[in-house]
From Swiss-Prot:
Region span, Disordered: 31-309
Positions of the pro-segment in this chain: 36-302
Residues that hold Ca(2+) according to the record: D647, D650, D655, D658
Record's compositionally biased regions (Basic and acidic residues): 84-95, 103-143, 173-183, 240-267
Origin: domain of life: Bacteria
Cellular component terms (Gene Ontology): extracellular region
Protein name: Lipase
InterPro entries associated with the record: AB_hydrolase_fold, Lip-like_C, YSIRK_signal_dom
Active site per UniProt: S418 (nucleophile), D609 (charge relay system), H648 (charge relay system)
Organism lineage string: Bacteria, Bacillati, Bacillota, Bacilli, Bacillales
A matching Pfam family: Lip_C
EC number: 3.1.1.3
Length: 688
């Protein structure tokens, strides 16, 4: 009975061992597949582990299938059932395997014959359990297998002895693989948990950082608001540039340190929203505040910190000068010609500058009044007494004003080319002393009077700079400008462009040289023929004569609080006869007048720039002057050295055919002039 139990145990072991081995392989394959599905989103490390386990299982499956060729589909079905129990009762399977090991050790002394019989019984038992077709097939080959088994009895006995050790090794490997797989799963799960915790911590840090930044921005805003008006725009510009960068750096601290956090959609969206909201709020506030401060473009106190010059530069053109919006198409840009835009270049290099738009043919007085309203803004008032004296209308065009807050203490730089130099001198005289005739007229007749004519507006001009200005008049106007035919020609041009369809404006509308809306052109021509303009001295042609300039010099004086400076050019050379002849590079239209001035009776007047004599451009005869040095002075004309080979328009770059005067030279000249104006503010500033 005891022997019978041992045989039964061996047979049971053989069947069970095979079933367990196959079940274990299936379990490992199924477990690996399940683990692979669960870890599909966790990276390539888990995939490579699953693939490695699958490859090992395939090798073990091929080895065991060779040893168990007689085990077929039904055993597989049974093994699947056992696999489910093994999946749920792993400790029991280990105990059972240990019992089988002990039982196998007790049967090591069995003979080869008994082992063969047991193998035959093993085959027969399995044959009885098979379907009918499989049993017939097994019986057919029973005798053949019996002979094979007898011939390999010794080898089979050794195989039986070694099977327990192989099973032990296989089970141990499978167990180690399972533990390793579970360990990796736990490790990956731990990493995921740590990653989520880190993300949560980062979000918490981001929220704290953003709150601190918002507090700092609010504090900075309050501090800037408390500062004086002169520092407002600059402070807000600095905050708007620095604060968004500060938010960008702190609002996303985990970008470089923890790249895996980018895969967390919730964390990424949260950080993105935090960053965008923080930056947008800072920029929006700073932009609105700066926009409010810069809304009034004529408020110098809100703009001056943006420029190198505290006092704006006003460029004033000469006779027959225009701005681009009202000039004839045949004329080039006044300030810079085809070489450059002087005003724009000054702006780009940090200087606040404007181009004045005043009458092209008007007198210095009328042009000075227009210049005042161009800067200050408002409707031009030529004065009741002045209009009645010369026979033109009292009111002219309306200007918007480029510097509405212009008043004593808020100064400007006046730069005049040609006749523009006379005009700015006239304006400064009106600001300081007004017009006594207008004051008396207003007392007698009542009505309104412009503040310009009341005087008492000192400390409104920082400097006066003239370029090729005929301070003492010019022979060109004496000999040609006031000839009847020349005057008629000039005014006919103005009359022609005065039609209602023309955009050209010569600044003679207050003289009636502008066609009315309901007036035909024939009616317009007949009306202007009776204008007093043709014989009036209230015109530019008269003021450019030596008599007209002398009259202006008598009415004007030097202001001790203003820096005066003149720039002069010449473009003629002396002949054997002692006269001056125009150079080859002189602007072609000026060769006639240049040669005419070069033949003047007064030798000191002969050297000229084509329109103005050098002696007339340097300074008014009746006013004090000195040679200019690196150190500026107030209350005296500072005469700069004469620029040789510079004709009348080279100062403003209008001669595009002149190869000697380059754009770089012109730009360098104006940059030096602007820098000198800034230096003069140290002498004239009222904020010392």
């Amino acid at each position: 009975m005891k022997t019978r139990q041992n045989k039964y145990s061996i047979r049971k072991f053989s069947v069970g061992a095979s079933s367990i081995l196959i079940a274990a392989l299936l379990f490992m394959g199924g477990g690996s597949a399940q683990a692979a599905e669960q870890q599909q989103d966790k990276g390539t490390v888990e995939n490579s582990t699953t693939q490695s386990i699958g490859d090992g299982n395939e090798k073990l499956s091929e080895q065991q299938s060779t040893q168990n060729k007689n085990v077929n589909e039904k055993s597989n079905v049974n093994s699947i059932t056992e696999n489910e129990s093994l999946h749920n009762e792993t400790p029991k399977n280990e105990d059972w395997i240990q019992q089988q090991k002990d039982s196998q050790n007790d049967n090591k002394s069995e003979s080869v014959v008994e082992q063969n019989k047991e193998n035959e019984a093993f085959v027969q038992n399995h044959s009885e359990e098979k379907p009918q077709q499989e049993q017939v097939e097994l019986e057919k080959h029973a005798s053949e297998n019996n002979q094979t088994l007898h011939s390999k009895a010794a080898q089979s006995n050794e195989d039986v002895k070694t099977k327990p050790s192989q099973l032990d090794n296989t089970a141990a490997k499978q167990e180690d693989s399972q533990k390793e797989n579970l360990s990796k799963q736990d490790t990956q799960s731990s990493k995921t948990t740590d990653l989520l915790r880190a993300t949560a911590q980062n979000q918490s840090k981001d929220s704290q950082s953003t709150e601190e930044i918002n507090k700092e921005v609010n504090n900075d805003t309050q501090q800037v608001t408390a500062k004086n008006d002169d520092a407002k725009v600059e402070s807000f510009n600095l905050n708007s540039k620095e604060e968004p960068l500060k938010v960008d750096k702190q609002a996303n601290p985990t970008t470089d340190k923890d790249k895996s956090s980018k895969n967390d959609k919730g964390s990424q969206d949260g950080l993105a929203n935090l960053e965008s909201n923080a930056v947008a709020t800072t920029n929006k506030q700073s932009k609105q505040q700066v926009s409010e401060k810069n809304e009034d473009q004529t408020n110098k106190s809100a703009k001056q910190k943006q420029y190198k010059n505290n006092d704006p530069i006003i460029l004033v053109h000469g006779f027959n000068g225009f701005t681009d919006d009202i000039n004839p198409s045949v004329l080039t840009h006044y300030w810079g010609g085809d070489k450059m835009n002087i005003r724009q270049d000054l702006e780009e290099n940090g200087y606040e500058a404007y181009e004045a738009s005043i009458s092209a043919f008007g007198s210095n007085y009328d042009r000075a009044v227009e210049l005042y309203y161009y800067i200050k803004g408002g409707r031009v008032d030529y004065g009741a007494a002045h209009a009645a004296k010369y026979g033109h209308e009292r009111y002219g065009k309306t200007y918007e004003g480029v510097y509405k807050d212009w008043k004593p203490g808020q100064k400007i730089h006046l730069v005049g080319h040609s006749m523009g130099g006379q005009t700015i001198r006239q304006l400064e005289e009106l600001l300081r002393h007004g017009n006594p005739e207008e004051v008396e007229y207003q007392k007698q007749h009542g009505g309104e009077i412009s503040p310009l004519y009341q005087g008492g507006h000192d400390n409104m001009v920082s400097s006066i700079t003239t370029l090729g200005t005929p301070h003492n008049g010019t022979h060109a106007s004496d000999l040609l400008g006031n000839e009847a035919i020349v005057r008629q020609l000039a005014y006919d041009v103005g009359k022609m462009y005065g039609n209602k369809d023309s955009r050209v404006d010569f600044g003679l509308e207050h003289w009636g040289l502008k066609q009315k809306p309901n007036e035909s052109y024939i009616q317009y021509v007949k009306r202007v023929q009776n204008s007093k303009l043709w014989k009036s001295k209230d015109s530019g042609l008269h003021d450019l004569t030596r008599d007209g300039a002398t009259d202006l010099n008598r009415k004007t004086s030097l202001n001790p609080n203003i820096v005066y400076k003149t720039y002069t050019g010449e473009s003629t050379h002396k002949t054997l006869a002692g006269k001056q002849k125009a150079d080859l590079n002189m602007f072609l239209p000026f060769t006639i007048t240049g040669n005419l001035i070069g033949k003047a009776k007064e030798k000191e007047w002969r050297e000229n720039d084509g329109l103005v004599s050098v002696i007339s451009s340097q300074h008014p005869f009746n006013q004090k002057y000195v040679e200019a040095t690196d150190k500026n002075q107030k209350g005296v004309w500072q005469v700069t050295p004469t620029k040789h080979d510079w004709d009348h328009v080279d100062f403003v770059g209008q001669d595009s055919t002149d190869t000697k005067r380059t754009r770089d030279e012109l730009q360098q000249f104006w940059h030096g002039l602007a820098e000198d104006l800034v230096q003069s503010e140290q002498l004239t500033s009222t904020n010392k």
